[in-house]
Amino acid sequence: ENAAATAEGAVAEAVQNSPVTLRGSLCILTGYGRCGSAIHQCLKNWGCTIVVYDCDENACERAKEAGAKICEYKDLSKVLKKAAFLFNTAPSAVWTERVLEGVPQEVCILELASMPGGIDRESISMSCRAFRDVLRRVHQADCWERRF
């Protein structure tokens, strides 16, 4: 399944591109559709604490039932300051300049959403040089078809 392959690829990228250990880390996951729920399961298996944001209340309820903590949009910036990893699967602008303000350089950010994605790339590169090294496009339109 494509969502499972995306989740495994995302976790592999996170492990490879972060100076901290994924196991037991605080992870933010935005978007709880097929890919988001698959990533949640992988992170849960690694013993991570997962905080989910999704604008859909039903998606939040599913995430909560699966063991995730739920975050409101207004609290994303505060939670991000404590997180080690951010996995975005939301295809609309969630991570704006305002929300990303003051983000620690150590946070490993992975953009998995279809273009245009949910992360304001200019804000990241302006605020934290280190993000250019870890910001990855794990899932692209035909990437998994060629690999799997």
Roles of regions detected by a PLM:
Residues E1-G24, G118-F148:
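Adenosine-phosphate binding glycine-rich loop
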Residues C35, N58, M115:
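Conserved Rossmann-like nucleotide-cofactor binding loop
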